[in-house]
């Protein structure tokens, strides 16, 4: 992949290009005017990972770019700073590098560094090695942890040493409210926190008149949307298959005093089967699905989007909130969903400036019977 070049002076131009591209791509669905949410033009990414490149006595952060003259060859790009990343990450990069240069124990066979930071300045650093970590490493890593004011995790094959904690606490400001989120190392979190705040605000806005119904959320992760949307609904059932994410989502529900939501460790397909009465068992019984009236579904699928069967299952809901990280798969899914639903809100979130990546939000509402295709 190409290393993004941060040029704040061309930020608006690149955002306008995305706006035009997305507007043209989805024109045939006759959506309302596109709502556009800009990113900070620099220092917008709260998590990053870098290779640690060793050259003699030197070492430096690196990324790789494909050589245009030889697609099979990757060029090593040295990074002394990274304007894409948060200011906290940029402050840590040289301080950590200097500490590594001064310690044979910490630098030996270190090949990757991962940073996870928050808007409030918390930081977690993961050091990944091609060797097993011992007591000498732990002693020096603990000293480094204190010097840098961060939490440190050491990783190697079949080894994970958590010196302090394996997470940070993010605090997001949305519509005058503060939501707190435990974000666990090596699990998915929204990388652009400013845009995440915009996404949560938009999702709250499009579901505001929903208190008489219940929400089902698929692919809920650590409860990012679950926490922010719960007060808009009578009850919420959120599904997720990752044990780590389910545990973190439950922590976040408790941290935000959300009492009307539950997280079920099951796939979207399993939930749909349970809702249809085709799947039973202890976990299904605990959800008491027959006591719910699900009027709204929220989906935030991976880049592959939804398969045809999943789209069919969504058609039973009055409203669908679709958060997409891939306009092409969103377009394909809307082709199927538009037979029964119409796009009534449409948003572009500039999650990754200076790249072709577009994050979109769509609200679909069921067509009147006579209007269905």
UniProtKB/Swiss-Prot annotation:
Known catalytic reactions: uridine(54) in tRNA + S-adenosyl-L-methionine = 5-methyluridine(54) in tRNA + S-adenosyl-L-homocysteine + H(+); uridine(341) in tmRNA + S-adenosyl-L-methionine = 5-methyluridine(341) in tmRNA + S-adenosyl-L-homocysteine + H(+)
Coiled coil: none
GO process terms (BP): tRNA methylation
Organism: Chromohalobacter salexigens (strain ATCC BAA-138 / DSM 3043 / CIP 106854 / NCIMB 13768 / 1H11)
Designated gene of the protein: trmA
Active-site residue list: 325 (nucleophile), 359 (proton acceptor)
Annotated protein name in UniProt: tRNA/tmRNA (uracil-C(5))-methyltransferase
Database matches in Pfam families: tRNA_U5-meth_tr
Assigned GO CC terms: cytosol
EC number(s) recorded for this UniProt protein: 2.1.1.-, 2.1.1.35
First-tier enzyme category under EC: transferase
Family: Belongs to the class I-like SAM-binding methyltransferase superfamily. RNA M5U methyltransferase family. TrmA subfamily.
Keywords assigned by UniProt, alphabetized: Methyltransferase, S-adenosyl-L-methionine, Transferase, tRNA processing
InterPro entries tied to this protein: MeTrfase_TrmA_AS, SAM-dependent_MTases_sf, TrmA_MeTrfase, U5_MeTrfase_fam
């Amino acid at each position: 992949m190409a290393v993004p070049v941060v040029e704040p002076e061309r930020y608006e131009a690149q955002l306008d290009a995305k706006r035009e591209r997305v507007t043209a791509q989805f024109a045939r669905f006759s959506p309302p005017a596109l709502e556009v949410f800009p990113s900070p033009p620099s220092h917008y990414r709260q998590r990053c990972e870098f290779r640690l490149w060793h050259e003699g006595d030197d070492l430096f952060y690196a990324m790789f770019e494909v050589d245009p003259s030889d697609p099979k060859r990757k060029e090593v790009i040295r990074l002394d700073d990274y304007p894409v990343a948060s200011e906290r990450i940029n402050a840590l990069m040289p301080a950590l590098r200097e500490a590594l240069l001064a310690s044979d124990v910490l630098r030996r066979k270190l090949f990757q560094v991962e940073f996870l930071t928050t808007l409030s300045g918390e930081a977690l650093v993961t050091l990944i090695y091609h060797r097993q970590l011992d007591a000498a490493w732990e002693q020096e890593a603990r000293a480094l942890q204190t010097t840098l004011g961060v939490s440190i995790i050491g990783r190697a094959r079949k080894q994970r040493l958590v010196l302090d904690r394996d997470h940070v606490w993010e605090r997001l400001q949305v519509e005058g409210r503060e939501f707190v989120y435990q974000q666990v190392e090596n699990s998915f979190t929204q990388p652009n926190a400013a845009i995440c705040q915009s996404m949560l605000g938009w999702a709250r806005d499009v579901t505001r008149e929903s208190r008489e119904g219940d929400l089902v959320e698929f692919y809920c992760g650590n409860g990012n949307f679950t926490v922010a949307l719960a007060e808009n609904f009578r009850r919420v059932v959120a599904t997720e298959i990752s044990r780590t994410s389910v545990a973190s989502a439950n922590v976040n529900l408790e941290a935000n005093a959300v009492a009307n939501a539950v997280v079920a460790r099951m796939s979207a397909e399993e939930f749909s089967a349970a809702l249809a009465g085709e799947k039973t068992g202890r976990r299904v019984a605990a959800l008491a699905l027959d006591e719910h009236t699900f009027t709204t579904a929220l989906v935030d699928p991976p880049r592959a989007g939804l398969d045809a069967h999943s789209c069919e299952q969504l058609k039973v809901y009055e409203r669908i909130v679709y958060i997409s990280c891939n306009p092409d798969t969103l377009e394909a899914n809307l082709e199927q969903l538009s037979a029964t639903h119409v796009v009534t809100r449409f948003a572009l979130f500039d999650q990754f400036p200076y790249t072709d990546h577009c994050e979109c939000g769509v609200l679909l509402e069921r067509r009147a019977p006579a209007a269905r295709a």
